[in-house]
Amino acid sequence: MRHRKRTAKLGRTGEHRNAMLANLVCSLIRHKRVTTTLAKAKAARPVAEKMVTLGKAATVHARRLVAARLRHPARTLHGSKAEREAWRKDEDVVRILFEELAPSFKERNGGYTRIVKLGERQGDAAQRAILEWVDFIAGAPSEPAGSGSATHTAGAKK
């Protein structure tokens, strides 16, 4: 019987599900927003929120817990060139989480992500959704207006 089991299985084995959720959260940390199915977004949301909570702790132990959850255990620095590159990308995700994301959520007590429903996918009618950080603004410029160089060039013709 499956009484009181809250984990969404998503039609996968436990190892496959954990790897998929870790990859989804890594993509969310790297790209600030991820388009996926509604079920996967709902399953990845608590994982992402726990990672930010650990990131706010900013301890060595928290960093190791995040790395253990988000990294593939077989990747090492001593493997092939592809494995070393994958390990460095995973390490970048941990760095981004602890140095950029977690400090921006220092004043917020939970609720770091939002799920925006998109509608159905054309091929199989699966509900799609965007999983993104609450403070993420899609078309925001990277630097404030007026701080850049002048918009007109010296020799421009009219």
Question: Where are these predicted regions, by residue range?
Answer:
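Structured, basic alpha/beta domains of bacterial-type, RNA-associated proteins
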Residues: 1-19, 23-158
